[in-house]
């Protein structure tokens, strides 16, 4: 027998420590699970995974350093102990498969997997609502180490059913970036009142698990295509974005948490920004580290002497008692040791190993045991309060703490050289901060038709058509969403697969290998089934620019991203003979190699096959679930052929004769997700009959195209296997009447519809239908259809045409197509609101904004009209809430949804625009947009309203960006026509300070919707009513297009002037500061560090009062200065002020008060009325101005707030600046509490 080497002896000592004293001695021999401790027999998922890591590491070390055969046996035994535990946890979770299925759709805490199980039986131990079960980090850390252990050679997953379950666990955690849970400490909000919140630890761990599992074969080297896990890259990047936004904060209620060490370093390595990693680490060291370890988070009451063991939850004001006496956990020093090993920082490793050795407790036979935590002795609490980190603490809790003990042993194995970082991290997650190579985005431009190809060639752009890229197949993005919805399906386990969600740009920028056929998918934004945004060519260019920029910064996959950008007939000018100028300019820039800050390589799809990222969708291959399309697919074939609704089933019948199963499946999906024309042109029936016969006899694509052309079938592309573009709906005769001059440009006057009456005085609907048929005005058609919609219902048959298809809904849909073709944006928005067209990305846009810790409000203040959205809502609930806040006004509702989508776009690409903004008030933003147009164009509120509603989506988005960015901008009428000749020619451009546009005070306080009054007036129009004239001042407010913010504001408050006064001041900057305050107030923008300063001032008074609403000083007893929760609390008080510029002046007054927080006095008063300070400052301002000769006209006051308009328009600094007067006012107000030397403020 060979003698043992020193390393062998050392390994044996660690084996005894693990097997006989600390971990494996507690493992259940049947389930493989580990109890939390001697007195807590339940098995926590997270604790079990971390506790087995030492066993896994020891097994790897034995396998690597085996001296003799017994060592190899020992390695196998240890590794199988790991497999047994991981499979035990798998059995626990797989017994709750119904919860996994439900949670994918609900994200509800009631549908979550349990956090702990019975060690002996794998059964649940407490009820769904009796514990904070939703802990996404626990599920994620299990999946992360499942991936790492599988990559290291362990075989944990044994069947395809288990593979499908793991795939569904991926769906379970992929929405972590928008799911509030209870976090790693199971408590949620730190008040421990069962309030879930978005936790950085959960988001980071989920991101790591998703990346680790992507394309991983769970059967290891013995696997095949069916055992591979698939992850959508866009979900990973959502987690990455939210994580970067959260850090170094841990959640809304925790400004820092030591658990973030597991996110920025081992095991997750989830952060790619090395600077952010260092910032977060230093925050933990600075705020949480003590003599015995680190606190979990500030004001953590767990096992402190002041915690009441008889109560589960804390009182909010009670949290102040835990400050400076939080328990310290040696566990976190083990993370610092591992971090030092992975980062190569030997000094850090040595420092924390020595520190940890000092707090270890020697057990029986000198075994080193790591206690759970160290607490302040009850009799020395006051001493610790006075001098933090000076009192000697005592160990408490579990001994050993298996989670910490395991990481301690793992750290020692690595520090002593038994394990290399690559062995414990075979998936190389430790290289996350290594700079990535530059990304070159490959763009393949495709033409819808040969005609478009010829037009592009005339411009020097050589492209292919859809047909020419065959056998590569092109599909819209929604088809990829449907394909992924079959991933993970398992009928035996009742798992439905991935929920249908819109596909992100990362997903559509890959090529896909599906049964030996290459597919490419077009970006989501060009899908015209969506909202009307895709009708605007400039908006398409902007969305393309955004996607290209996003790809450059977020692409992490092997190979280059490839975007397939189709040019359709909708991207042509109205004559159909030339390309839209915006599209053409974008194509030329991409050909030059740069667009939107991204490096571009244009070319043919076939040229990109070798350089693109290509994913094999192995789950589309035949598997145990059988065919991927319904079994009755072929059985329905004959029925569909014989049915009268043949066109609706056309796609299925064609594919039923094709031999390609994948094409049949994809086209079957398309047939059920694309719109179908309600009417078939009778003039084409013969041709379609012959075309149908041709389809039945051939599957060859080119033959199909040739026969279609011979039969003069229009829109050939709608019959191709690659159903990229949707057919245009046939135009009804209603829309074929020649356009009147009013429709060729934006009418300045809206048409009053005359309601015909019968002899009994009731509305004569047949006469109204006749009027509908005869009128040539699109606006009047929309008005008549709206009245029919509200009075008779959407399904009322107008009997306009004998062949049918003349219900109100169908006629509105036809009108929507027509106004979409001519880009009449006011009517597009109006009809979209009537039809309740779904903004498919609305709920995702709302969720994205909330995920960045931004609360949303819709409607205008005050509450209850202004509705707050603080948690993700389903689409139906969200639209209902918006409708309620809009008080039934369709235009406001539609505009609110549109603005929400734009805000989400900017949040994803330019989050810096929203710095120091914790609540986005969409109603006020719309109000400011209308106000800016009214004053910049010097027009009436009605004209500004019409201009706002008729802005193209790209112009609306541009205006929003200028308002968010804080840059000075101008709005003016353009002399050159727009591309559509319909939308108003308004240009928005950035200008310098000297050329800033003048804005005058609006005094807008509220939005009072008049939808009911307007409807009543419209329905009771007398026959004698005359049509208005053509002067802009005689605009008919009864037109539905005027049910927009500015018009309603004007009607309710009368604060809008009919026509803006011309500028009389020589100073072109007059109104600049008032405008700036109005914008900042509407956006809730505050100075950097404002909330921390408010927290300090609350320490020295009883509270701050704003318009009767008090921000109490007790808030500081619950919340710390850096909490988002505190910032939102302050916002909720300030938002009681409906007028934006007045609100901003109150912010400035509070900022002056915060300067007093640095003065060494105990108190500066009881409750400070902030508005009184502002009014004192206003009086001082008026008094001084009068002494300088200002008259009453110049010093006019705002009737709503009583503040002089000149004060609103004063710069903050300078002799006559607002800060000067506010400082004097604050000193006057609180002088009785200040030292005499500070009372004389100059």
Curated annotation (Swiss-Prot):
What happens to this protein after translation, modification-wise? Answer: Although the final Cys may be farnesylated, the terminal tripeptide is probably not removed, and the C-terminus is not methylated.
Which controlled-vocabulary keywords does the entry list?
Calmodulin-binding, Carbohydrate metabolism, Cell membrane, Glycogen metabolism, Lipoprotein, Membrane, Muscle protein, Phosphoprotein, Prenylation
- Where in this protein does the record say Phosphoserine is found? 630, 731, 737, 740, 760, 813, 974, 983, 987, 1009, 1020, 1022, 1025, 1132
| Molecular function GO terms recorded | calmodulin binding; choline-phosphate cytidylyltransferase activity
User: One GO CC term of this entry?
Assistant: phosphorylase kinase complex
The UniProt entry, under Pfam families, shows:
Glyco_hydro_15, KPBB_C
Q: Tell me a GO biological process for this protein.
A: phosphatidylcholine biosynthetic process
Activity regulation remarks: By phosphorylation of various serine residues and by calcium.
Question: Pathway it belongs to?
Answer: Glycan biosynthesis; glycogen metabolism
Residues linked to a lipid group, S-farnesyl cysteine type: 1239
Membrane topology per record: Lipid-anchor
Q: Where is this region: Calmodulin-binding?
A: 812-842, 1065-1105
Superkingdom of the source species: Eukaryota
Q: Where in the cell is it found?
A: Cell membrane
Family recorded in the similarity comment = Belongs to the phosphorylase b kinase regulatory chain family.
Subunit: Hexadecamer of 4 heterotetramers, each composed of alpha, beta, gamma, and delta subunits. Alpha (PHKA1 or PHKA2) and beta (PHKB) are regulatory subunits, gamma (PHKG1 or PHKG2) is the catalytic subunit, and delta is calmodulin.
> PANTHER family, alphabetically?
PHOSPHORYLASE B KINASE REGULATORY SUBUNIT, PHOSPHORYLASE B KINASE REGULATORY SUBUNIT ALPHA, SKELETAL MUSCLE ISOFORM
Function recorded in the entry: Phosphorylase b kinase catalyzes the phosphorylation of serine in certain substrates, including troponin I. The alpha chain may bind calmodulin.
What is this protein's name? Phosphorylase b kinase regulatory subunit alpha, skeletal muscle isoform
- Name the gene: Phka1
């Amino acid at each position: 027998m060979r003698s043992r080497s020193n390393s062998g002896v050392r390994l044996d000592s660690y084996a005894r420590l693990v097997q006989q004293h600390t971990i494996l001695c507690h493992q259940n021999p049947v389930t493989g699970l580990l109890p939390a401790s001697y007195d807590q027999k339940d098995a926590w998922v997270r604790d079990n995974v971390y506790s087995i890591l030492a066993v896994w590491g020891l097994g790897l070390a034995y396998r690597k350093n085996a001296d003799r055969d017994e060592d190899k046996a020992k390695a196998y035994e240890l590794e199988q102990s790991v497999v047994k535990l991981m499979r035990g946890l798998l059995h626990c979770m797989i017994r709750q498969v119904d919860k996994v299925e439900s949670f994918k759709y609900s994200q509800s805490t009631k549908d979550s997997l349990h956090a702990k199980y019975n060690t002996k039986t794998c059964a649940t131990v407490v009820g769904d609502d009796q514990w904070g079960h939703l802990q996404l980090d626990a599920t994620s850390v299990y999946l992360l180490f499942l991936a790492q252990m599988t990559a290291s050679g362990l075989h944990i997953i044994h069947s395809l059913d288990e593979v499908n379950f793991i795939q569904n666990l991926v769906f379970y955690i992929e929405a972590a970036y928008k799911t509030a849970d209870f976090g790693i400490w199971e408590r949620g909000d730190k008040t421990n009142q069962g309030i879930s919140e978005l936790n950085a630890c959960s988001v980071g761990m989920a991101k790591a698990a998703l990346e680790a599992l992507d394309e991983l074969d769970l059967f290891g080297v013995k696997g095949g295509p069916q055992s591979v896990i698939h992850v959508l890259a866009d979900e990973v990047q959502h987690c990455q974005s939210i994580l970067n936004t959260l850090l170094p904060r841990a959640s809304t209620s925790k400004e820092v948490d030591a658990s973030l060490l597991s996110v920025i370093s081992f095991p997750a390595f989830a952060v790619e920004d090395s600077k952010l990693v260092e910032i977060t680490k230093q925050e933990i060291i600075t705020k949480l580290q003590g003599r015995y370890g680190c606190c979990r988070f500030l004001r953590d009451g767990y096992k402190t002497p002041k915690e009441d063991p008889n109560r589960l939850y804390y009182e909010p004001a009670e949290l102040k008692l835990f400050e400076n006496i939080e328990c310290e956990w040696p566990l976190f020093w083990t993370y610092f040791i591992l971090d030092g090993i992975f980062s190569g920082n030997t000094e850090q490793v040595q420092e924390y190993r020595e520190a940890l050795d000092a707090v270890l407790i020697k057990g029986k036979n000198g075994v080193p045991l790591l206690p759970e935590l160290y607490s302040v002795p009850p009799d020395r609490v006051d001493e610790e309060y006075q001098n933090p980190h000076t009192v000697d603490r005592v160990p408490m809790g579990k001994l050993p703490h298996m989670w910490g003990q395991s990481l301690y042993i793992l750290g020692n194995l690595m520090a002593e050289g038994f394990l290399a970082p690559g062995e414990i991290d075979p998936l190389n997650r430790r290289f996350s901060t290594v700079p990535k190579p530059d990304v070159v985005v490959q763009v393949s431009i495709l033409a819808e038709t040969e005609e478009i190809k010829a037009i592009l060639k005339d411009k020097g752009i050589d492209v292919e058509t859809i047909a020419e890229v065959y056998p590569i197949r092109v599909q819209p993005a929604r088809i990829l969403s449907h394909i992924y919805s079959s991933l993970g399906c398992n009928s035996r386990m009742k798992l439905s697969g991935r929920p249908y969600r819109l596909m992100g740009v990362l997903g559509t920028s890959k090529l896909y290998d599906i049964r030996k056929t290459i597919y490419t998918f077009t970006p989501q934004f060009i899908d015209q089934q969506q909202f009307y945004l895709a009708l605007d060519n400039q908006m398409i260019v902007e969305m393309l620019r955004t996607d290209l920029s996003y790809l450059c910064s977020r692409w992490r996959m092997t190979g280059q991203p490839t975007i397939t950008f189709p040019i359709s007939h909708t991207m042509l000018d109205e004559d159909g003979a030339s390309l839209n100028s915006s599209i053409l300019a974008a194509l030329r820039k991409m050909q030059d190699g740069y667009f939107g800050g991204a490096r571009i390589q244009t070319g043919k799809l076939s040229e990109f096959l070798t350089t693109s990222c290509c994913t094999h969708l192995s789950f589309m291959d035949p598997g145990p679930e059988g065919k991927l399309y319904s079994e009755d697919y072929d059985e329905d074939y004959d029925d569909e052929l014989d049915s009268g609704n043949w066109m609706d089933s056309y796609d299925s019948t064609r594919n039923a004769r094709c031999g390609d199963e994948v094409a049949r499946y994809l086209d079957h999906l398309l047939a059920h997700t694309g719109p179908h024309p309600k009417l078939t042109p009778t003039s084409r029936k013969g041709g379609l009959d012959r075309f149908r016969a041709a389809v039945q006899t051939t599957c060859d694509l080119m033959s199909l195209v040739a026969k279609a052309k011979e039969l003069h079938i229009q829109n050939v592309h709608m019959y191709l296997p690659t159903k990229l573009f949707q057919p245009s709906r046939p135009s009804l005769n209603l829309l074929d009447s020649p356009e009147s001059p009013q429709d060729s440009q934006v009418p300045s006057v809206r048409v009053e519809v005359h309601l015909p009456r019968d002899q009994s005085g009731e509305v004569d609907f047949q006469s109204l239908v006749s009027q509908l048929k005869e009128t040539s005005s699109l606006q009047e058609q929309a008005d008549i259809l709206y009245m029919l919609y509200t009075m008779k219902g959407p399904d009322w048959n107008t009997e306009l045409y004998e062949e049918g298809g003349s219900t109100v809904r169908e006629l509105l849909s036809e009108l929507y197509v027509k106004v979409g073709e001519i880009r009449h944006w006011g009517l597009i928005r109006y009809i979209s609101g009537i039809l309740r067209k779904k903004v498919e990305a609305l709920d995702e846009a709302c969720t994205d904004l909330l995920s960045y810790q931004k609360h949303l409000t819709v409607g205008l203040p005050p509450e209850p009209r202004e509705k707050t959205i603080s948690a993700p809502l389903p689409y139906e609930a969200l639209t209902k809430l918006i409708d309620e806040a809009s008080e039934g006004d369709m235009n406001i509702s539609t505009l609110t949804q549109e603005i929400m989508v734009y805000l989400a776009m900017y949040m994803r690409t330019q989050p810096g625009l929203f710095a120091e903004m914790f609540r986005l008030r969409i109603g006020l933003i719309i109000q400011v947009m209308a106000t800016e147009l009214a004053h910049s164009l010097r027009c009436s509120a009605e004209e500004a309203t019409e201009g706002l509603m008729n802005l193209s989506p790209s112009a609306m988005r541009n205006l929003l960006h200028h308002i968010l960015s804080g840059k000075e901008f101008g709005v003016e009428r353009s002399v050159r026509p727009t591309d559509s000749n319909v939308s108003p020619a308004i240009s928005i451009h950035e200008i310098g300070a000297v050329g800033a546009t003048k804005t005058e005070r609006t005094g807008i306080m509220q939005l009072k919707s008049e939808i009911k009054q307007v409807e009543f007036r419209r329905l009771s129009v007398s026959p004698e009513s005359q049509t208005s004239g053509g002067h802009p001042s005689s605009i008919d407010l009864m037109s539905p297009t005027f049910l927009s913010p500015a018009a309603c504001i004007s009607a309710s408050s009368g604060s809008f002037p009919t026509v803006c006064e011309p500028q009389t001041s020589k100073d072109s900057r007059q109104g600049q500061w008032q405008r700036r305050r109005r914008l900042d107030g509407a956006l809730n923008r505050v100075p950097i560090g404002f909330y921390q300063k408010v927290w300090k001032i609350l320490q020295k008074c009883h509270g701050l009062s704003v318009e009767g609403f008090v921000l109490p000083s007790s808030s500081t007893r619950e919340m710390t200065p850096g909490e988002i929760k505190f910032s939102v609390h302050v916002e909720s008080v300030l938002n009681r002020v409906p007028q934006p510029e007045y609100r901003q002046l109150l912010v400035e007054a509070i900022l002056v008060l915060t300067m007093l927080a640095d003065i060494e006095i105990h108190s500066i008063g009881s409750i400070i009325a902030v508005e009184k300070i502002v009014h004192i400052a206003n009086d001082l301002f008026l008094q001084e101005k009068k002494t300088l000769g200002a008259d009453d006209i110049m010093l006019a006051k705002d009737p709503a707030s009583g503040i002089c308009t000149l004060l609103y328009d004063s710069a903050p600094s300078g002799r006559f600046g607002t800060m000067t007067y506010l400082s004097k006012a604050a000193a006057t107000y609180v002088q009785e509490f200040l030292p005499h030397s500070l009372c004389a403020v100059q």
